[in-house]
């Protein structure tokens, strides 16, 4: 059976600014209350999901675009609850499968095939599990992934007609020479032209244990540079690490341990990082899905509107091949 949890917008405190400096609405919680729905493969829905799912959706009446989210290496999909809630509160339905739970993870090919099964389930299976009067626009779906899930998101975009792809510190292996299979970074250019946003981290390439969690040669820069046919944006969260988009204390013990001790983390609160990532995702999709470009273009023009420091912000418009670069000192 599906389980639902309600979440309502937090009440604001009059006269107390949420941020120390000016910001944009996308970096704060949106206008919609949200519902979190959990679905197991044993669900009586027809067809049942091929993998356990978390769905976070606006609770109000409306038609909303869909984001398929793919979790990071051996992490629980429950570990991203703050980001899911923020994005859904701005009018998106987030569908997050638990592709696997094992350490070490399965082969990247098996992970890709599992993600493909969920993508194929969406048109037939998603709508019947949503609240009454909440409609999913499955004709316009974005795929988004973190870490190794970012690699899977890009690989899936080479196979299916998604509306956009988003990589959150995507990783394609432990080094340039030990990539995952399928090795999509072996391509000089990805064979798609859909809009792309890639958000990297400044500390992802810094080793804490044996190796860095997002090593140079297999990280966000490599993915961005291969999107040669797409309108594409690139952001780097300078002072944050690979796991800093997760909840503060993931409920899953394994995810908690990986989050705290496996990767180099930033020294500041994770909340501004999560709000920054969520806000960029919302602004990007509002631009390319809804035609509302104001917030996204404002972030590109002046990254200081973000709640954290962003370096080397770059945007390339495929229609004109013009490049806008903003290096924040």
UniProtKB/Swiss-Prot annotation:
<dbReference type="InterPro" id="IPR029058">
    <property type="entry name" value="AB_hydrolase_fold"/>
</dbReference>
<keyword id="KW-0150">Chloroplast</keyword>
<comment type="pathway">
    <text>Porphyrin-containing compound metabolism; chlorophyll degradation.</text>
</comment>
<feature type="active site" description="Nucleophile">
    <location>
        <position position="147"/>
    </location>
</feature>
<feature type="short sequence motif" description="GXSXG">
    <location>
        <begin position="145"/>
        <end position="149"/>
    </location>
</feature>
<protein>
    <recommendedName>
        <fullName>Chlorophyllase-1, chloroplastic</fullName>
        <ecNumber>3.1.1.14</ecNumber>
    </recommendedName>
</protein>
<dbReference type="InterPro" id="IPR048264">
    <property type="entry name" value="Chlorophyllase"/>
</dbReference>
<dbReference type="GO" id="GO:0009507">
    <property type="term" value="C:chloroplast"/>
</dbReference>
<dbReference type="GO" id="GO:0015996">
    <property type="term" value="P:chlorophyll catabolic process"/>
</dbReference>
<keyword id="KW-0881">Chlorophyll catabolism</keyword>
<dbReference type="Pfam" id="PF07224">
    <property type="entry name" value="Chlorophyllase"/>
</dbReference>
<feature type="active site" description="Charge relay system">
    <location>
        <position position="242"/>
    </location>
</feature>
<keyword id="KW-0378">Hydrolase</keyword>
<comment type="similarity">
    <text>Belongs to the AB hydrolase superfamily. Lipase family.</text>
</comment>
<feature type="active site" description="Charge relay system">
    <location>
        <position position="169"/>
    </location>
</feature>
<keyword id="KW-0934">Plastid</keyword>
<keyword id="KW-0809">Transit peptide</keyword>
<feature type="transit peptide" description="Chloroplast">
    <location>
        <begin position="1"/>
        <end position="21"/>
    </location>
</feature>
<dbReference type="GO" id="GO:0047746">
    <property type="term" value="F:chlorophyllase activity"/>
</dbReference>
<dbReference type="InterPro" id="IPR017395">
    <property type="entry name" value="Chlorophyllase-like"/>
</dbReference>
<comment type="function">
    <text>Catalyzes the hydrolysis of ester bond in chlorophyll to yield chlorophyllide and phytol.</text>
</comment>
């Amino acid at each position: 059976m599906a389980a639902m949890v309600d979440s309502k917008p937090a009440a604001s405190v009059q006269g107390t600014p949420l941020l120390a400096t000016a910001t944009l609405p996308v970096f704060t919680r949106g206008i919609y209350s949200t519902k979190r729905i959990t679905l197991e493969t044993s669900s009586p829905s027809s067809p049942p999901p091929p993998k356990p799912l978390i769905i976070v959706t606006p609770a109000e009446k409306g038609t909303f675009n869909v984001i398929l989210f793919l979790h990071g290496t051996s992490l629980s999909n429950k570990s991203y609850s703050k980001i899911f809630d923020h994005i859904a509160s701005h009018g998106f339905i987030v569908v997050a499968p638990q592709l696997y739970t094992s350490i070490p993870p399965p082969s990247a090919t098996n992970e890709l095939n599992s993600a493909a099964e969920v993508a194929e389930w969406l048109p037939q299976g998603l709508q019947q599990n949503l609240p009454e009067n909440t409609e999913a626009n499955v004709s316009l779906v974005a795929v988004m992934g973190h870490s190794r899930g970012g690699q899977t998101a890009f690989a899936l975009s080479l196979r299916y007609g998604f509306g956009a792809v988003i990589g959150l510190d995507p990783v394609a292996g432990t080094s340039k020479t030990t990539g995952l299979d399928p090795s999509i970074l072996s391509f000089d250019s990805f064979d798609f032209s859909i809009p792309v946003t890639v958000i990297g981290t400044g500390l992802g390439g810094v080793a804490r244990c044996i190796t860095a969690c997002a090593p140079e040669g297999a990280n966000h820069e490599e993915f961005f540079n291969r999107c040669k046919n797409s309108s594409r944006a690139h952001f780097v969260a300078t002072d944050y690490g690979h796991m800093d988009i997760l909840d503060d204390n993931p409920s899953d013990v394994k995810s908690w341990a990986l989050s705290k001790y496996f990767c180099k983390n930033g020294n500041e609160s994770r909340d501004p990082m999560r709000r920054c990532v969520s806000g960029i995702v919302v602004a990007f999709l509002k631009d390319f899905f809804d035609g509302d470009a104001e917030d996204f273009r404002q972030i590109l023009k002046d990254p200081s509107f973000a709640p954290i420091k962003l370096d080397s912000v770059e945007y390339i418009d495929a229609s004109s091949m013009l490049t806008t670069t903003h290096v924040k000192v």
